[in-house]
Amino acid sequence: MKSIIYQQLAEKKKQGQKSFAVLIDPDKVDAGVLDELVELSIAAKVDYLLVGGSLVISNHLDDCVRHIKKSCDIPVILFPGSPSQISKYADALLYLSLISGRNPELLIGQHVVSAPFVRQSGLEIMPTGYVVVDGGAPTTVSYISNATPVPADKNEIAMCTAMAGEMLGMKLIYMDAGSGAKRPISESMIKSVADHIEVPLIIGGGIVHPEKAYLNCKAGADVIVVGNAIEKDASLIREMSDAVHSVPVLKGLDVS
């Protein structure tokens, strides 16, 4: 299987380079909005475009991905809410396993059903341990998954969950407070997790200020994902990207 994007993510982590990803929900954008998001992402040097959502109820996924690929060279990574959210036109797929919940369907059940189709897609598959954290309000992902999120103040639960995911073979850990969360994941929780895993750490949900994106990276996040805030104000793309990319690169330096 291909591993181009994952190798890039792993190398960036090794070097201490932070990445910024814009999350695009196909249900919430038309061609005009999509063009604007892509144009702003190119100008802001966005690293990745994530496409998907907890509920994609339209059949626009393929059209959305093809439109993006035609317009730019930014890698497109699928962020599926269900096995049906697959487009062969993307570059890679976050193959999400909800390791923070106790719903067997989202841990492995749906993957058994989707595996043949995922393999046939030709996409780069990135096994991802998905950890939902309480963002202070009910979210679509928590409702759909019927799973209790990790309490916002229980850093040790998040840490042990991420460690277990890594030891089970997950190549990425994605911690998410959910779209439109009132309370983003704390820096202390991010640091607790980042200090105990070696795979790249993705953080999303409730990030509305560039300063928070910066602080998350300083705490140990490798990739910052923002979607809801950008849907409301697309001009935030540059500010968020600049904040993430301004984090000093400290690892991988020869200090001898």
Where are these regions (language model features)?
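Short N-terminal or domain-adjacent regulatory/targeting segments
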Residues: 1-11, 30-35
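Alpha/beta enzyme core
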Residues: 15, 19, 26-203, 208-249, ...
